[in-house]
Each structure stands twice: as structure tokens, then as C-alpha cells.
A protein has these predicted regions:
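Carbohydrate transferase catalytic cores enriched for Leloir-type hexosyltransferases
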Residues: 1-481
């Protein structure tokens, strides 16, 4: 969404950067458009596409070859950092690879009307994965007295925007803007994945960016406040620019009957055999039969989030169980999102409900289908202990739903009055918040008033509302001494 928003700015030329998170792109880079050698250039770019998805090595021999390559490449990269050599950005033209660019990077979040715009853009490729850049610094920390990061050749660009603290050194003429989403790896390190690595990687890159004079575009005032607790000296370099929410989420007419079809077709199928109850053919058949046979109105609560400790799924399930036992035994719970980390205890707790066809864990739900789920849910619930922004509440507002959320600073900031708040540490408080939201939904006049408020607040997070802030900020950074 950010890239599409930036493409709409008229006063600057925007180039996209293609980079992997965890695995390097090992194909040979193309460094300039070569009109005289089209076949060779297309072949080279085709190999880059392959490298994004597959390194081509199979079986035991492939594993050995891969391991040797990783060791040799690691030695070479460490030497290049010590020598101060820069990594060049490759050139990538999407004109012959439109399907790859669209479906891999944009199709899940952008409407198809945006396809021509993102495919007309220019792209560069950074072959080193973000994880590689972090590990290079970490692996050299014991060898060098001063922490060093890999240099990246960016002299063709005035401004470089990174979606995380950037573990690299840009060319001297290029100014860095860090899109800062949250300080959770620092303030809630017990909730993150691969804690030691991600905590150290986040802090070290962030500290390097601060020292180098980087600017920070924080996704919320709450995130900016956390950042300034750590580095108060960057107050003048840190601004708030909220996230842009996809225009796919809008209030349209859709029959509630679609919900059962969406639920039955998107049932989660985990790889772990331990949780086969979530995906066995027996469970699938039972769930679909239960959905088809149930003549009652399909009433459900909705939560959209990866399953991980910070998101507070366990408390929500406990609250839902109380609601069922006290007030409405027919109330279902729909959870949309993949299994992240530290989820075993939670999954063990929900398996009986899944087997009974009362709780539904969904994955790979397309944005238009998610829009329908938001619209018809009794309440969309955002129970996290901490967030940087939290898209799901705004998406629900835009889609015509009602939102109940944990009473944390970022929710108060982003959702304002278009939300019912509860204490995320109290199951009884969650129950009370959900009941209040359901009552609001069921009262036509109150619901209409709520919807007017939700439309007004969610309109702040459209591209039309956010793009002027980016324009102003980038222009100011570009003109800064």
C-alpha cells in the first residue's frame, strides 16, 4: 500500500525495491537495460524470478551444495564488509514479468485497477536478504571493535525508504527514511519470534540509523512515543504518518449467505501432524455438513490476526466461551490468520471447539472475502496487548462492521470513538465489551450513528488522506542539509 501511495506523488520519481526477507537472491544481477542484448537480459531477469522462489537444488546433494554455498558466500560477504565494498542494486523491468510482480507483491492488498500503475513503475533488486544484512553485522561483532554494516550502493537515489530499521549503510548522498511500525522487539521481546536474534537485530539497526541521521515515519503517535523513549534526541526527525488501508475494504451490498461459503472454503490446513484435527478430511466434512444443516442465522465474532502471544487469542476464546454459556450458545467464533509462533497451547485449547463446528480457523482469505466477513460479523475484535497500528479494526469500519478493541494507546488513537474498549488482561472486561458492541449492532438507530462515526474516522486512512503527508515529509527530508 505504501508503494502505491508513493506512486501517486507527482513531484518525485519513485522506484520500487525488490528484496527477500530470509533468503538471498543468488541469480546474477542485471545492472542496466541492454536494448542490444534483449535475449540475454530477459534470460537473466527470468533467473532472478526463479531465485525469488527456488534455488534449484534438490535432495541430499542439493542440501550439501546449498550448505557449502552458504559458508563460502558468508566468508565472501564478511570480507566485503571489512574491505568496505558496496553491494550494487540490480535492475529489473517488469514488462515481461508482469504476472510475477503483480501476484507476488501486490495482488493480495491492491485492487486490480491499480495493476497498471504498479507494473509501469521502475524496480531495483537488492540481492542480499534483510536477514543476511542483520547476520553480517552480528557475525562481525566479535571480530571488529566497531560494529560494521554492509554498504549498499544507492547514489542514484536522493531518498531511500526502509520498512524496518535498515541494517546497511547507504551512499553518502542518499537520505534514509525508516518506516517505523513498532518497538515491540524492545518493549515486549518475550512475545516475538526468535527472540535473541530479532531483539538484537532490531536494536542494533535502529541505533545505527539514529546515529547516521536517518528520519523516521512512525505509523502512529503511540509508536513515535515508544521510539522517543529509547532515542529522545531524534524528536525533530520523527513524524507520524498513519498507515494507508486498501480501498478493497468498502461498504458494499453482499448477502450474508456468502459467509458460510467463505468459511467452508477457507478452513485452515496446518502442516503440523499434531494439529490434524484442525484440517482432517473428517473435520472438513463435518464442518461443511454442520454449516449446511444449520438453518439458524450464522452469528459469529471475528478476529483477524496471526496466532502469536501478543495478539491475545487465548483471552478472546475464554471470553467467547463465557458469552456462549451465559447468553448465546449459537454464537460462533471465526479466527482468520496463520499460525505464527508459540501457539501450541492455544491450538490444544481450541481443537475441541473446532471438532464440534463452533470455532473456525481460516487462512488464505482473499481481501474481498475478508471484507464480507467484516461486514456480517456481530463484532470484529482486536484484543492485542500491543500494536503499532492494527489494520483489522479500520478494515472492519470501512467494510461496515462494528469494532471492539483492547484499551491500549494505539487503539484509542487510531479508532477513537468508533470502537468499544475493554481491558485485554480481564476476560470479564472482554465479555462486557463484546456484549456492548453486540447491543450497539442490534439497535438500528445507535448502529446508524456508529456507522457515521466509523466512516468519518476510517476515511483518515485512505490514500487520498495520507499521501499529502508523505509528499510533505519526503520533500522536507530531500531538502534538508
Amino acid at each position: 500500500m505504501l508503494f502505491r501511495t508513493l506512486l501517486g506523488l507527482k513531484k518525485m520519481a519513485v522506484t520500487g525495491l525488490l528484496q527477500q526477507g530470509g533468503r538471498d537472491i543468488t541469480a546474477k544481477m542485471v545492472y542496466a537495460a541492454e536494448s542490444e542484448r534483449p535475449a540475454a537480459q530477459i534470460r537473466a531477469m527470468s533467473k532472478i524470478v526463479v531465485s525469488f522462489t527456488d534455488d534449484g537444488r534438490r535432495g541430499v546433494a542439493g542440501a550439501i551444495s546449498r550448505a557449502i554455498s552458504i559458508v563460502m558466500r558468508g566468508i565472501s560477504l564478511r570480507a566485503s564488509v571489512i574491505a568496505g565494498l558496496s553491494e550494487k542494486l540490480g535492475f529489473f523491468a517488469p514488462v515481461e514479468f508482469e504476472d510475477f510482480v503483480w501476484r507476488r507483491f501486490f495482488a493480495k492488498t491492491l485492487p486490480v485497477d491499480d495493476r497498471p500503475h504498479v507494473l509501469a513503475a521502475q524496480y531495483r533488486v537488492l540481492p542480499l536478504a534483510m536477514a543476511t544484512l542483520h547476520r553480517l553485522k552480528i557475525s562481525l561483532s566479535g571480530l571488529l571493535r566497531v560494529k560494521r554494516f554492509k554498504k549498499i550502493e544507492t547514489r542514484d537515489f536522493d531518498v531511500f525508504i526502509s520498512q524496518t530499521p535498515f541494517p546497511g549503510v547507504l551512499s553518502s548522498n542518499t537520505k534514509l527514511i525508516v518506516r517505523y511500525h513498532d518497538a515491540i522487539p524492545i518493549f515486549l521481546p518475550h512475545t516475538i519470534k526468535d527472540r535473541a536474534f530479532h531483539h538484537g537485530a532490531h536494536y542494533d539497526a535502529l541505533a545505527r540509523n539514529v546515529r547516521s541521521g536517518a528520519y523516521f515515519a512512525c505509523v502512529s503517535a503511540a509508536t513515535r512515543n515508544d521510539l522517543l523513549k529509547i532515542f529522545p534526541e531524534i524528536e525533530d526527525r520523527a513524524v507520524v504518518i498513519h498507515n494507508t488501508v486498501s480501498p478493497i475494504y468498502s461498504e458494499i451490498d453482499s448477502p450474508k449467505e456468502l459467509v458460510k461459503d467463505i468459511v467452508s472454503s477457507r478452513l485452515f490446513r496446518p502442516l503440523a501432524k499434531k494439529y490434524k484435527a484442525l484440517s482432517s478430511s473428517h473435520a472438513d466434512v463435518f464442518t461443511r455438513s454442520r454449516l449446511n444443516a444449520d438453518q439458524q442465522d450464522f452469528e459469529y465474532l471475528l478476529m483477524v490476526s496471526t496466532v502469536e502471544p501478543r495478539k491475545n487469542h487465548t483471552s478472546l476464546v475464554a471470553a467467547w466461551e463465557l458469552l456462549r454459556s451465559r447468553h448465546n450458545e449459537a454464537l460462533k467464533l471465526v479466527l482468520v490468520g496463520d499460525l505464527g509462533w508459540d501457539y501450541a497451547e492455544f491450538v490444544d485449547a481450541i481443537v475441541p471447539w473446532v471438532e464440534r463446528g463452533e470455532l473456525f480457523l481460516l487462512s488464505n482469505v482473499a481481501a474481498p472475502d475478508l471484507r464480507d466477513l467484516y461486514k456480517h460479523a456481530k463484532v470484529t475484535i482486536c484484543p492485542s496487548y500491543a500494536e503499532g497500528f492494527d489494520y483489522s479494526g479500520v478494515e472492519a469500519m470501512m467494510s461496515g462492521g462494528v469494532v471492539a478493541a483492547s484499551d491500549i494507546p494505539v487503539h484509542r488513537e487510531v479508532y477513537e470513538d468508533a470502537c468499544i474498549y475493554f481491558n485485554p488482561y480481564s476476560v470479564e472486561s472482554i465479555v462486557g465489551g463484546i456484549r456492548e458492541a453486540i447491543s450497539l449492532r442490534n439497535a438500528s438507530e445507535t448502529f446508524a450513528e456508529y456507522r457515521r462515526c466509523a466512516k468519518r474516522i476510517s476515511a483518515r486512512y485512505t490514500a487520498e488522506a495520507i499521501s499529502p503527508r508523505w509528499d510533505e515529509f519526503i520533500q522536507s527530508v530531500g531538502s534538508a542539509p
